[in-house]
From Swiss-Prot:
This is Cathepsin B. GO terms for cellular component: extracellular space; lysosome. PANTHER family: CYSTEINE PROTEASE FAMILY C1-RELATED (PTHR12411). It catalyses: Hydrolysis of proteins with broad specificity for peptide bonds. Preferentially cleaves -Arg-Arg-|-Xaa bonds in small molecule substrates (thus differing from cathepsin L). In addition to being an endopeptidase, shows peptidyl-dipeptidase activity, liberating C-terminal dipeptides. SMART domains: Pept_C1. Thiol protease which is believed to participate in intracellular degradation and turnover of proteins. Disulfide bonds join C92-C121, C104-C145, C138-C191, C167-C195, C175-C182. Pfam families: Peptidase_C1 (PF00112). One of its GO terms (biological process) is proteolysis involved in protein catabolic process. It is found in: Lysosome. It comes from Dictyostelium discoideum (Social amoeba). Keywords: Disulfide bond, Glycoprotein, Hydrolase, Lysosome, Protease, Signal, Thiol protease, Zymogen.
Length: 311
């Protein structure tokens, strides 16, 4: 009996040790919700072991082009207390789409290309998704997956223009939603000035340009622009707590500076007394509030590097 009991104990110890070995390194999938004054943080293992800085590709260029600066026009369109570009221009379905920058620090290109796509629809009635790949790989003034400047991106749209996604789709490797953002990052692919083989489009004839580009000197000017002409690109500083954003109006609370990130601003408003911008991120719908977030106006420099243009 004692021998049998000893064997049972030994087997239990072996199995326990084996189980521990199996579980080492596995995602816990645990969720910890923290309620801040204006927003909710949901801590998960989504960003564990990820070099988040590689996602944050906004790099101010020392050779940044000097753009026209727009100010608030008191005689222009009046600014409402809240605004949502998605509901204001319902026929432009790209406004509400959440993209996936995948294994690449291409946020600077996504913010520009998404906003320009929306504006082609709003102003020219063109329902065409501009190619992220064209800008990421062929904009020689920026550094592709290593990062870029939003101002340079819009200048490239003005000078060179981008082809459509139908001509040149985004082929940066992605990963399952549960692994967003991706663990491994890639080098920038080579520029291919040809449409994909199954497309009837011709690269040189499929270019879509911006006629004019500009930045802004105030929140009032930014909001008036969104109401008048549609979404804009905005770049800001990402801190550690932003990664766990889930809902509410984000206000930087804790954590270190991780880098610069660019997104698309689609609206604004006030929630519980806090003035905010509404933005679409490009980390898939698994992040944040189905891929979107609200951020306090002016927080983290969200009002400092904003750029847009007209076709």
């Amino acid at each position: 009996m004692r021998v049998l009991l000893s064997l049972v104990v030994i087997l239990f110890i072996i199995n326990s040790a084996f189980a521990v070995k199996i579980n080492i390194g596995r995602p816990t999938k645990s969720h910890k919700t923290i309620h801040h004054e204006t927003w909710v943080e949901e801590q998960t293992d989504q960003f564990d072991n990820i070099k988040v800085g590689q996602l944050l590709g906004f790099k101010r260029s020392p050779n940044r082009p000097k753009l026209q600066i727009k100010s608030y026009d008191p005689l222009g369109v009046q600014i409402p207390t809240s605004f949502n570009a998605q509901t204001n221009w319902p026929n432009c379905t790209t406004i509400s789409q959440i993209q996936n920058q995948a294994r690449c620090g291409s946020c600077w290109a996504f913010g520009a290309t998404e906003s320009a796509t929306d504006r082609l629809c709003i102003h020219n009635n063109e329902n065409v998704q501009l190619s992220f790949m064209d800008m990421v790989t062929c904009d020689e003034t920026d550094n592709g997956c290593e990062g870029g400047d939003a101002f340079s991106a819009w200048n490239w749209l003005r000078k060179q223009g981008a082809v459509s996604e139908e001509c040149l789709p985004y082929t940066i490797p992605t990963c399952p939603p549960a692994q967003q953002p991706c663990l491994n990052f890639v080098n920038t692919p080579s520029c291919t000035k040809e449409c994909q083989s199954n497309s009837s489009l011709i690269y040189s004839q499929d270019k879509h340009k911006m006629a004019k580009i500009y930045s802004f000197d105030s929140d009032e000017a930014i909001m008036q622009e969104i109401v008048t002409n549609g979404p804009v690109e905005a770049c800001f500083t990402v801190f550690e707590d932003f990664l766990a954003y889930k809902s509410g109006v984000y206000v930087h609370t804790t954590g270190k500076d991780l880098g610069g990130h660019c997104v698309k601003l689609v609206g604004f408003g006030t929630l519980n007394g806090v003035d905010y911008y509404a933005a679409n991120n490009q980390w898939t719908t698994s992040w944040g509030d189905n891929g979107t977030f609200l951020i306090k106006r002016g927080d983290c420099g969200i009002s400092d590097d904003v750029v847009a243009g007209l076709p």
